[in-house]
Regions:
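Positively charged, small/polar-rich N-terminal and surface patches that mediate targeting and assembly
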Residues: 1-99
C-alpha cells in the first residue's frame, strides 16, 4: 500500500482533477489554500507579492495500478507546463495500515 501527497498551484486544480478522473481515482482528501515554498520555487503565501497558494491532495492506494496511472498522467501534464516551478509534485510514502 502507498500513501501519496500531490501538491500543486491552485491554478492547476481543475487539471489535477482531470488527471484523477483519467486514472480512475475518485477518493482523496484535499486541502486548499496551503502555504509554503518548495525547492527552487517562489513562496506561495496567499498575500503580498506571493499571493498564490497551493492545494494538497492526499490519497491512500491499496492497489498500485491507479497510482502508476496517476504518476504517468502527472509526468505527461508536467511536460506541458513551461515553468519547472509550476509543475505538479507527487510525494509517495509507504502505507503500513488503513483502518
Amino acid at each position: 500500500m502507498k500513501f501519496v501527497f500531490v501538491v500543486h498551484s491552485e491554478h492547476y486544480t481543475a487539471r489535477v482533477m482531470q488527471l484523477f478522473d483519467a486514472a480512475g481515482i475518485d477518493y482523496y482528501t484535499r486541502w486548499d489554500q496551503a502555504q509554503g515554498k518548495g525547492h527552487g520555487t517562489e513562496p506561495h503565501l496567499g498575500r503580498g507579492s506571493y499571493s498564490s497558494t497551493n492545494s494538497v491532495m492526499m490519497i491512500a492506494f491499496q492497489d498500485e495500478a491507479p497510482l502508476e496511472a496517476l504518476i504517468r498522467a502527472i509526468m505527461a501534464a508536467n511536460a506541458e507546463i513551461k515553468r519547472a516551478a509550476d509543475r505538479i509534485r507527487l510525494f509517495q510514502l509507504p502505507l503500513e495500515r488503513m483502518v
